[in-house]
Amino acid sequence: MRVRGATAKRRLIGLVAAVLLLICGQVPQTAAARWKPQVGLPEWWDTDARGRGPARIILLYNSGGMPAWTVDRLRYYISHVTADGTPDHWFFDTVLVLALTGESQRSFEPNYGKGPALAEDWQQYLDGRLFGGLSELAALEKAVHEANARLGGSSHVVRVIISIPYPDPRATKFGTVEGKALNFSRAEDRAEAVRWYLREVSRRWSASQFEHLRLGGFYWVREEAPASDDDLLKLVSGLVGRQLLPFYWIPYFGSEGSGKWQELGFDVAIQQPNYFFYDVPPERIDEAARFAREHRMGVEIEMDRRVVNSPERRERYESYLNGGVDQGYLYSGTLAWYDDAALLECGQSKDPAVRRLYDTTYRFVSGKYRKQWSNDARIEK
């Protein structure tokens, strides 16, 4: 009932905007922010998989060797920070913390790193960057706490999704978990490692007693789902479901298994268009959006730090935002951002053309975006 009401409201806003366009010759910014897309929207796109309303997820990578996510860096994602360094609005509501490699550079995702990660890598990730002395979750907690103080409240909470390392079958000598030597060529040992990891994350999360963070789910880090992983994924889905948490996946464009993600047990899947990175036509964004609609998926918005120095890359990024209006995913329940820390650099930049991307992204995330017919970068309050 709430979904249908939201859809009707969106149509009414579009109609009002059209009338104003005929009368005044221009579209007011508030109406343009929700201009009717070029395609019909499925009703389920108004909520995430558990009906909790929109989720805007920023992917924060903490692979081995990457710079730590400090409070000063995180605040540009938790809140919108003005050009003079002052937080003035909340920004992303959900953070996905994920690593592709451990400190050893062994791989949590089989397409990266120097061979499969071992038990010591999984343990070190838990003990270090997640919950130990280098804990970026603790930094995130502090960043949200400080933003609450600056924005005049104390109750804002950010959801956190934690990635699950891939139990790579090549790790025939994975190491010891709870006194048992595991061999990932055996399906039961792969399952045992994931079961242990989920227990450890949940136990340590509870012990941390975060005030401003909520454990919001788990993420499958491998971006493809070969048939050989079907049984494992269904088992992991059950383990995550027992904690009453959603299970997330973000497959690349054309990835094996992406069309059957629900059968595999995922609660939320988000489609990568992969337009920003490769020499493919802009129509890729439309194609990915259509696939996402047909398969009840969200859409990933993509950029990297090349936007700082390349006008062509900035234009590519804005194609995703304009596509959100044309294809309707601006209004979808779940969107994710891959940015390679680019939004941080954009937010700190003194170059107006670069800083503009940060402000424009904020408008998109907050539902105030209008399609870019001009270089107007004003923020709606």
Model-predicted regions and their roles:
Residues 16-24:
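Bacterial N-terminal signal peptides
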Residues 56-58, 91-96, 157-161, 214-219, ...:
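Structural preference for beta-strand elements that scaffold enzyme active sites
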